[in-house]
Amino acid sequence: MQEFDKSISFDGRDIRLKMGTLAPQAGGSVLIQSGDTAVLVTATRAKGRDGIDFLPLTVDYEGRLYAAGRIPGGFLRREGRPPEKATLISRLIDRPLRPLFPHWLRDELQIVATTLSMDEEVPPDVLAVTGASVAVILAQIPFKGPMAAVRVGLVGDDFIINPTYREVHNGDLDLVVAGTPAGIVMVEAGANQLPEQDIIEAIDFGYEAVQDLINAQRELMTDLGITLATSEPPPVNTAVEEFIANRASKKIITVLGQFDLGKDGRDAALDEIKATEVETAIAELPETDPVKQSVEEDPKLVGNLYKALTKKLMRKQIVDDGVRVDGRKLEQVRPISCEVGFLPRRVHGSGLFNRGLTQVLSLATLGSPGDAQDLADDLHPEDEKRYLHHYNFPPYSVGEARPMRSPGRREIGHGALAERAIIPVLPPQEDFPYVVRVVSEVLSSNGSTSMGSVCGSTLALMDAGVPIKKPVSGAAMGLIKEGDEIRILTDIQGIEDFLGDMDFKVAGTDSGITALQMDMKIDGLSMEVVSKAIMQALPARLHILDKMLATIREPRPELSPFAPRLLTLKIEPEHIGMVIGPGGKTIKGITEQTSCKIDIADDGTVTIASSEGERAERARQMIYNMTRKLNEGEVYLGRVTRIIPIGAFVEVLPGKEGMIHISQLTEGRVGKVEDEVGVGDEVIVKVREIDSKGRLNLTRLGIHPDEAAEARRNASRG
């Protein structure tokens, strides 16, 4: 491809597309740049593997530290396993892209987005999403595009397109909208308890901006003389399809109408129909029968067509009758139960949340500021995280037996969504300096486990005594679209997620939304439908919230006795080195003496963590004494450190020494200093003078017995 540049004037900032220069062997490649942020996005297509029945699409985002002029840490000094942020951006690219490929496509597809340069103004993620659309178009991969994405922020009362990092951080909204000419295909947002109507307006505002980027891609296609690639669906084997429908339809409809079967009973009944009414009947056909020959040629044909028939009949039941497979109405939430304090208090907080067959146990742990997650080797400009949510999805939660692995993209994505939902209600760090980690263990899954994790997290935090501003609940909405008929489902379960067209998760408080995430399986939704789904989620969220508040109305007033106690004090930044000491000697000594964990921030904030308040207070007093300003007339219990002919040096506080002149040791004449004191002796001294160089002149004279007693008490406290 020849080199080609195109600049798009977009909302006051140019976006530049550069093609034909980099990655010439990739199917399609584009360097998309805004400001000093530049992302190379490639799309490559290869022959698919035999026998697969899914689209093998891989999306990888790579954030290189050289893009920000930095060298990685660690021994190897190179990037290692992608950080969580990179995984989330990979998912952000994948989610709006995947539904736009033909569902019958079986070629290997790989999208790779690599940030080559990055400034502190323009995030690379939405550039990568739009760049992926351009790369796919250039690679001539069948695709219902063009597709583009923008970020929407809220500064004051005004929505803005593609805000800077600072504007997002200081604002109340971080929303990404992706769309095609057919409608909206993906929404993801974190918000500071914004009302539903504000969120709807923000999505609409973003989708209008998306149209500009879609039109720019159309212009690019015209300039390059290319069109969107298309792919015809493979022919359906109508003979086998009709055979299965004739044998199984009525029995499937009967099973779908038996609402008391439950998930396992329904699955077993459907499997039984498939085995007895379809597979057994095909096995009994003569070898010359076209149906039997087709099935022998494609062993997966029966399974795929039977699944398609079940999907069709379930969707028809919802559209025609307004009844779901478990008998619920479209807007009805499954039965809910909650429990807090489920585990002993050695676990700082625990919450068990049940919704239908979905069960999530969330566990909260409180730590000191030093437990914050260090993001120093992440390309993005966050330094650390003080609230962490981790989501685990073991195989037994769906009745499977398979090897346990480290968290995959799904687990990371679900954990991040639940984390995002809770962050707006956390107390300010100055009021509650703890680092908080919540782990959500999915013990049983039948849909909406990420929103179950939001509810479980809220329960666990309140049980742990974390003073959250408001409790957060969440619900997952689904969609069935058959022609012009649209049905929105509240609180979808697993089969409705699998056979439906949308998974729209909404979390928030009774004041507004804190997080949402919408994924589509079709090529776009209108604003009208998106708006209706958001509004339909509100009564569901409030209903769930009522159930949670019936279990625990407010955070516990006391922390678990096993949670660390934190004390803080502020020292002058220039004293930090003194507290740490050479090679960390001083602070290690305090830690060993008090069994406390001590963290010192760059601004001089010292946080002391201990399971025992007395130990923490002793450490605080030791650091305070080291860094406090001494005044003339104050009395201390000190220790003699060395003797010289004219006097003795006494350490009155850690790191603070003064001298007692021989004439100040006692009343009357002293022949030798050693006659009065020796090295290691404890002595009561008063600060007689602080000279112009800050040196302490001490005395043992004129000290009242009460002053001496107070000095001894202070010394005993550290």
Curated annotation (Swiss-Prot):
Binding site for Mg(2+): 497, 503
EC number(s) from the headed UniProt entry: 2.7.7.8
InterPro entries noted in UniProt: ExoRNase_PH_dom1 (IPR001247), ExoRNase_PH_dom2 (IPR015847), ExoRNase_PH_dom2_sf (IPR036345), KH_dom (IPR004087), KH_dom_type_1 (IPR004088), KH_dom_type_1_sf (IPR036612), NA-bd_OB-fold (IPR012340), PNPase (IPR012162)
Gene3D superfamilies linked: GHMP Kinase, N-terminal domain (3.30.230.70), K Homology domain, type 1 (3.30.1370.10), Nucleic acid-binding proteins (2.40.50.140)
Location of this chain's protein in the cell: Cytoplasm
Catalytic activity as recorded in UniProt: RNA(n+1) + phosphate = RNA(n) + a ribonucleoside 5'-diphosphate
One Gene Ontology molecular-function label: 3'-5'-RNA exonuclease activity
Key words of the record: Cytoplasm, Magnesium, Metal-binding, Nucleotidyltransferase, RNA-binding, Transferase
SMART domains: KH, S1
Source organism superkingdom: Bacteria
Requisite cofactors: Mg(2+)
Family: Belongs to the polyribonucleotide nucleotidyltransferase family.
Subunit structure comment from the entry: Interacts with RNase E (rne).
HAMAP family reported in the protein's UniProt record: PNPase (MF_01595)
Function: Involved in mRNA degradation. Catalyzes the phosphorolysis of single-stranded polyribonucleotides processively in the 3'- to 5'-direction.
Protein name as it appears in the record: Polyribonucleotide nucleotidyltransferase
Species of provenance: Synechocystis sp. (strain ATCC 27184 / PCC 6803 / Kazusa)
Underlying gene: pnp
